[in-house]
């Protein structure tokens, strides 16, 4: 098992050579989530010939930008460190790959859905999930 394999693995490694490999991540594109579909469709409308999709670092960056946006909104546009730090506490978004995310108040850490996926023929089949896992609960 590995904690960071995503669908981009199959661009570099034939899926049959890693059949059955398990991974635990915050998103797989096989998840039937409305926002995932919206983002996937927008990406492939623009980059139809791409063999790669944005992997886990990109989804984390997306989530971070969405949470930052919510902090800016909550601070009424005050970009001072103090105002943004206060506004980030408890910030949340539903517009993130893999589902919602929230900064746990008082911690500065993000909680989000987590999924265990197993490669079945070049797709990570989600075999287990946990909603809104706080940081540090996975290991």
Locations of regions flagged by a protein language model:
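Extracytosolic ligand-binding ectodomains
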Residues: 1-139
